[in-house]
UniProtKB/Swiss-Prot annotation:
Pfam families from the UniProt entry: EAL, YkuI_C
Gene name of the record: ykuI
Family annotation (Gene3D superfamilies): 1.20.5.170, EAL domain, PAS domain
Protein's name according to its UniProt entry: Uncharacterized EAL-domain containing protein YkuI
Organism (species): Bacillus subtilis (strain 168)
GO molecular function, one term: cyclic-guanylate-specific phosphodiesterase activity
Domain of life (superkingdom): Bacteria
Amino acid sequence: MLDPLDILTNIDDVLPYYQAIFSAEEQKVVGYEVLGRILADSEIQSLGPFFLDAGIPEEYKLEVDNRIIRQALDRFLEADSDLLIFMNQDANLLMLDHGESFLELLKEYEAKGIELHRFVLEITEHNFEGDIEQLYHMLAYYRTYGIKIAVDNIGKESSNLDRIALLSPDLLKIDLQALKVSQPSPSYEHVLYSISLLARKIGAALLYEDIEANFQLQYAWRNGGRYFQGYYLVSPSETFLERDVLKQRLKTEFHQFITHEKKKLETVYEHSEQFYKRVHQAVTSLRKNNLSSDDDFIKKLAEELTDCSFRIYMCDEEGDQLTGNVFKQDGEWIYQPEYAEKNWSWRPYFLENIMRMRNLRKGFFSDLYSDLETGEMIRTFSYPMDDQMYLFIDLPYSYLYEQDGLI
């Protein structure tokens, strides 16, 4: 890293770079993130390490940051009047004067022609060391001026979703650095799913950053990304781009994503239809045997479905379990009576799925999820026996893996 004193001595060589942010809706540049750079030893170097170094005095950082911002805003004065301006700020430094000096700087440029609603203030929640309530009040004050708030680096380090929800940002920036392989870990998928749910609840848009490959762009598109940023799209530059520079390319890639996703959904639907026919046939056949109890019924059904299931049970429409479990352990079916009378209505989508079965009168697969007891990625097939009784069949990962399109 460059010596901080060298940076201050050569502050005239500090300059802003701009990384374009693209819209999923219009496939065009909607704004730029302002990044700090310095010309040193005849090459452009990032100032990221300088700003992240806790040992560098605050006044040094503020001086360099102020120069970068002023140069950038002078450039935005000459650009399209609807471009969003994303600026990283250290929340700890902002709180030194409760954000007043930074706000005054933005107001100065408002007077020159940049409307305040174009500014997006990026902060990193997990780096903030002060009182989160005070930070919330400062950001709420900023928002009264129309300034947007983005919480940055989500997914890169430990982010506190409660604190993020309290800050109520306009955007959540999700870092895809952890997505370095084409098949992300289930736990990472779950974290991003939780973040997407939070975004929906608090009305925040998702911006995926650090996109460095096609599969990461596809992942961001599939997981609710409204905005995209990263080297796979464009590298940071000293100049602005034509706003439609990637429009045709993004249209082509999105079309490929849509085609792939439609095919995948059709495959799951076809598997669901075939599995429904198999279960329906088995249930109809077993009902003719007049078995003495529902527990005997699911034991017999387990034998019929032994190649594709590892747990079977029945519940009523309120989630009360009417049978025990039949559970496959070490390749053998065992009966678990202790599960009878447990209630599962608290589980996500349980009641929604009950109503869906009641109305459609058909069975269907759940999404892929992690089983609470085994930790294995599974799907559940839900089947309506009648208006009062519903059958649940858990399918193991080993079976799903063998079926095209169920993973």
